[in-house]
């Protein structure tokens, strides 16, 4: 998935903090697994390595998805939306867990009967993932 020239990065509409929204979608099922942020460096690293890299706004640092948990995201395809301000990545989620809560997806709550209902089970206790 290597990029030949970095000029393609100029087509992305970065926000005032130099970030763009990035959606990770399971390549096989189409399910949205997570939404995060990318800066130029993380998007370039993602294109060059084929492994999803993000920018952590809370930690203010580059973040290779799965660097602590082992739940890497292998990128199959990168797409830029019509406005140039959202990236969608078709990914293979190694280990089947994308969410830090130990679930397949960060979108595990569904709006039902006027409130949020948890509809996806925890696949692995986060304490076992991050503090074995």
Curated annotation (Swiss-Prot):
Biological process (GO), any one: L-histidine biosynthetic process
Catalyzed chemical reaction(s): 1-(5-phospho-beta-D-ribosyl)-5'-AMP + H2O = 1-(5-phospho-beta-D-ribosyl)-5-[(5-phospho-beta-D-ribosylamino)methylideneamino]imidazole-4-carboxamide
GO cellular component, one term: cytoplasm
An example molecular function term from Gene Ontology annotations: magnesium ion binding
Residue positions binding Mg(2+): 81, 83, 85
Coiled coil: none
Keywords attached to this entry: Amino-acid biosynthesis, Cytoplasm, Histidine biosynthesis, Hydrolase, Magnesium, Metal-binding, Zinc
Cofactor binding, per record: Binds 1 Mg(2+) ion per subunit. Binds 1 zinc ion per subunit.
InterPro entries linked to this entry: PRA-CH, PRib_AMP_CycHydrolase_dom, PRib_AMP_CycHydrolase_sf
Origin superkingdom: Bacteria
EC number: 3.5.4.19
Protein family: Belongs to the PRA-CH family.
Biological function: Catalyzes the hydrolysis of the adenine ring of phosphoribosyl-AMP.
The protein's name in its UniProt record: Phosphoribosyl-AMP cyclohydrolase
UniProt lineage: Bacteria, Pseudomonadati, Pseudomonadota, Betaproteobacteria, Neisseriales
């Amino acid at each position: 998935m290597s990029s030949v020239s970095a000029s393609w990065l100029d087509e992305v509409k970065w926000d005032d903090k130099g970030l763009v929204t990035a959606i990770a979608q399971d390549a096989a099922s189409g399910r949205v697994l997570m939404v995060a942020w990318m800066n130029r460096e993380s998007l370039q690293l993602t294109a060059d390595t084929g492994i999803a890299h993000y920018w952590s706004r809370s930690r203010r640092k580059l973040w290779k998805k799965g660097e602590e948990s082992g739940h890497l995201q292998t990128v199959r395809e990168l797409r830029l939306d019509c406005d140039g301000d959202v990236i969608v990545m078709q990914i293979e989620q190694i280990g089947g867990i994308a969410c830090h809560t130990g679930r397949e997806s960060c979108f595990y709550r569904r709006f039902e009967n006027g409130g949020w209902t948890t509809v996806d089970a925890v696949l692995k206790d986060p304490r076992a993932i991050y503090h074995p």
